[in-house]
């Protein structure tokens, strides 16, 4: 029911026109429909979805150990106070002052809450990631060889498409926009995506800078879209 009352992070890529699976029109109709459709009810039965739900606590535990950061999972769906048509629930939230094992970018960012999005990539889905630009990879060249890499430069001000920015960070565009909505909710300077690759049972962590341009577009497109939902 809460998901019907606004646009969550998983809706962000649809609002911005970069979701390859769902159109904006389909999303608007879904939001205007009070009850879950049969198709939506079946989503929870999919093996990939059940696997993701079951593995989420394990991935949070592994990411917490890798980063030396306490990561908690908030239990509720939250509403943006200034933008009530936007909602947010979090897979994980960490606090930067507790980071011990990882080189974070700026001392001024200490004490900030940051989103840590959790994903499981199937063997088919992992082609959408580039672990060679991840800030941490558990397996490299097929061997267990935990490796850290420098944080990528901030490209949020570059005149790039969302797809190009997502490719730069090594993640799918629909998770780039989701992370941006999560960062906006927390006023976070950056966020992380912790991914377990099903094929070799390894975790990679991707670092993404805040993108004000994309966040502003989410506010505008979300408002416009919600007006259309209310008119349906």
Placement of each model-derived feature along the sequence:
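Acidic/proline-rich low-complexity IDRs
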Residues: 14-15, 23-26, 42, 103, ...
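Residue-level signal for secondary-structure boundary elements
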Residues: 36, 40, 226-232
């Amino acid at each position: 029911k809460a998901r019907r009352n606004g646009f969550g992070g998983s809706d962000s890529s649809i609002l911005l026109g970069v979701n390859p699976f769902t159109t904006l029109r389909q999303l608007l109709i879904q939001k205007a429909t009070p009850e879950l459709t049969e198709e939506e009810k079946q989503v929870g039965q999919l093996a990939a979805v059940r696997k993701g739900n079951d593995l989420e606590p394990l991935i949070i535990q592994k990411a917490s150990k890798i980063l030396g950061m306490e990561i908690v999972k908030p239990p509720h769906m939250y509403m943006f106070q200034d933008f009530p048509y936007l909602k947010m629930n979090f897979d994980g939230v960490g606090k930067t002052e507790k980071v011990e094992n990882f080189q974070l970018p700026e001392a001024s960012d200490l004490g900030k809450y940051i989103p840590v999005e959790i994903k499981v990539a199937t063997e088919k889905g992992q082609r959408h990631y580039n672990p060679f630009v991840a800030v941490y990879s558990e397996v490299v060249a097929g061997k267990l060889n935990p490796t850290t890499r420098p944080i990528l430069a901030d490209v949020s001000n570059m005149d790039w498409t969302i797809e190009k920015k997502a490719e730069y960070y090594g993640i799918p565009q629909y998770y780039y926009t989701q992370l941006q909505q999560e960062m906006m909710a927390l006023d976070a300077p950056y966020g992380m995506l912790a991914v377990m690759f099903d094929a070799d049972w390894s975790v990679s962590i991707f670092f993404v800078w805040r993108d004000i341009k994309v966040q502003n577009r989410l506010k505008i497109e979300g408002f416009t879209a919600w007006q259309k939902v209310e008119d349906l």
